[in-house]
């Protein structure tokens, strides 16, 4: 039996696609950290599409040593004020939810305590869509090979990009319709204003004519 010799050959387009995923992967992870003073509230807002899985992990570093009864509350809401996740006295944890509509979502951290307490360090990592999927778990459940997992990621990423372009096209059409409707209203208002000015000018001419006749300035 002859053994394999030389490096493993990869198809050019497939290798390019996998390289694209490798380069895109790290940049698609969104993480943020900030300092939260005592008795203050800070919120982060993000627009997210419909029917997307959103996952996140947070960690709050308490540098007060438990002084002042310091407590930090975490709450995630949509634009209508519906609570999607809430945690009292949050320190470290994870959350997940699925969006029902395209909306603006708000993640708020609120610190409460007494006395002079050092600022807390809040670390938040949020992912949604393709980034939020656990492909390792999918590979275990569906018994996929590493290459098949990367192809699944590529398929999901392509679908996400197509959906984003479709949404942008829809928004463009809506904005164009709004612009055309606004232009039509402006045109009608301009015509109405012109007739009003013509009517006012005509009325002034007749009024002045009667006035001058009454004063016998003209015949």
UniProtKB/Swiss-Prot annotation:
Gene Ontology MF terms: protein transmembrane transporter activity; protein-containing complex binding; syntaxin binding
Protein name as catalogued: Transmembrane emp24 domain-containing protein 10
Domain remarks in the Swiss-Prot or TrEMBL record: The GOLD domain is required for proper p24 heterooligomeric complex formation and efficient transport of GPI-anchored proteins. The lumenal domain mediates localization to the plasma membrane by partially overriding the ER retention by the cytoplasmic domain.
This protein's record includes keyword Membrane: yes
Region annotation (Required for TMED10 and TMED2 cis-Golgi network localization) ranges: 147-178
Known partners and oligomeric status: Predominantly dimeric and to a lesser extent monomeric in the ER. Monomer and dimer in ERGIC and cis-Golgi network. Forms homooligomer (via GOLD domain); the assembly is promoted by direct binding with leaderless cargos and may form a protein channel that facilitates cargo entry into the ERGIC. Forms heterooligomeric complexes with other members of the p24 family such as TMED2, TMED7 and TMED9.
GO BP annotation list: COPI-coated vesicle budding; cytosol to ERGIC protein transport; endoplasmic reticulum to Golgi vesicle-mediated transport; Golgi organization; intracellular protein transport; kidney development; positive regulation of interleukin-1 production; positive regulation of protein secretion
Localization in the cell: Endoplasmic reticulum membrane; Endoplasmic reticulum-Golgi intermediate compartment membrane; Golgi apparatus membrane; Golgi apparatus, cis-Golgi network membrane
Keyword check for Signal: yes
Gene name of this polypeptide: Tmed10
């Amino acid at each position: 039996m002859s053994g394999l010799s030389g490096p493993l050959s990869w198809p050019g387009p497939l290798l390019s696609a996998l390289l694209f995923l490798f380069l895109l992967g790290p940049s698609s992870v969104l993480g943020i950290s900030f300092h939260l003073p005592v008795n203050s509230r800070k919120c982060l807002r993000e627009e997210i599409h419909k029917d997307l899985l959103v996952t996140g992990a947070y960690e709050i570093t308490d540098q007060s040593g438990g002084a002042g009864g310091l407590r930090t509350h975490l709450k995630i809401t949509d634009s209508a004020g519906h609570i999607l996740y809430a945690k009292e006295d949050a320190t470290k944890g994870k959350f997940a939810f699925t969006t029902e509509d395209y909306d603006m979502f708000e993640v708020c951290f609120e610190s409460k305590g007494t006395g002079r307490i050092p600022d807390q360090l809040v670390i938040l990592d949020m992912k949604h869509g393709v980034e939020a999927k656990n492909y390792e778990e999918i590979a275990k459940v569906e018994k996929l090979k590493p290459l098949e997992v990367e192809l699944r990621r590529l398929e999901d990423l392509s679908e996400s990009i197509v959906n984003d372009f479709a949404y942008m096209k829809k928004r463009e059409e809506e904005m164009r319709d709004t612009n055309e409707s606004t232009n039509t209203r402006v045109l009608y208002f301009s015509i109405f204003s012109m007739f009003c000015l013509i009517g006012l000018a005509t009325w002034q001419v007749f009024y002045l004519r009667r006035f001058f006749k009454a004063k016998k300035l003209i015949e």
